[in-house]
């Protein structure tokens, strides 16, 4: 008869792990900023020389930079190269596959996944950077449009959040809304 009164403690455990103090949240915001600052330096001409630097060299620069700061990486970072090497009907398709060749070249779109650990807090940041051709002053229009579409998908996803909804239903709703707007959403 008492067995019917037993309930799972999982929600309590998850809530405990998710709970952060105001001080922890301030430290977390600072840690996120540090993470973005490290990525900005990694993607700068201080670290990358197009035609010479490899994506793996940038990965190891990230790891060393974090160690030099007395921090730890949360996971092994990645730096992927996405390259428009062919004339295609859709530039988006050209940038949808990574390449095994690792030397960073002008015209490449770089993507990193990088996280830092400090005081039991962990960041997980993904960021892109475009490597301009000599004399190029702006990102190509097709990349600007692709990022705007990606941001729209993010908005559709977060707009689909709601109390009591499952992750799968939120995902399904966001994907349906994206397709209805003529996007090719992938979450």
Question: What label would you give each PLM region?
Answer:
Residues 1-187:
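Active-site neighborhoods and metal-handling regions in enzymes and metal-associated proteins
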């Amino acid at each position: 008869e008492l067995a019917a009164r037993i309930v799972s403690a999982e929600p309590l455990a998850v809530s405990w792990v998710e709970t952060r103090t105001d001080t922890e949240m301030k430290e977390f915001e600072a840690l996120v900023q540090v993470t973005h600052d490290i990525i900005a330096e990694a993607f700068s001409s201080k670290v990358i020389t197009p035609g010479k630097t490899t994506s793996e060299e940038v990965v190891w620069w990230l790891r060393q930079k974090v160690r030099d700061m007395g921090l730890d990486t949360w996971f092994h970072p990645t730096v992927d190269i996405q390259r428009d090497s062919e004339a295609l009907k859709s530039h988006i398709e050209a940038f949808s596959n990574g390449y095994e060749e690792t030397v960073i070249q002008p015209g490449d779109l770089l993507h990193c996944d990088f996280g830092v650990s400090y005081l039991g807090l962990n960041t997980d940041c993904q960021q892109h950077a475009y490597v301009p051709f000599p004399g190029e002053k702006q990102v190509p229009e097709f990349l600007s449009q692709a990022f705007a579409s990606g941001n729209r998908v993010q908005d559709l996803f977060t707009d689909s959040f709601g109390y009591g909804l499952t992750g799968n239903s939120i995902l399904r709703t966001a994907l349906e809304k994206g397709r209805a707007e003529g996007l090719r959403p992938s979450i």
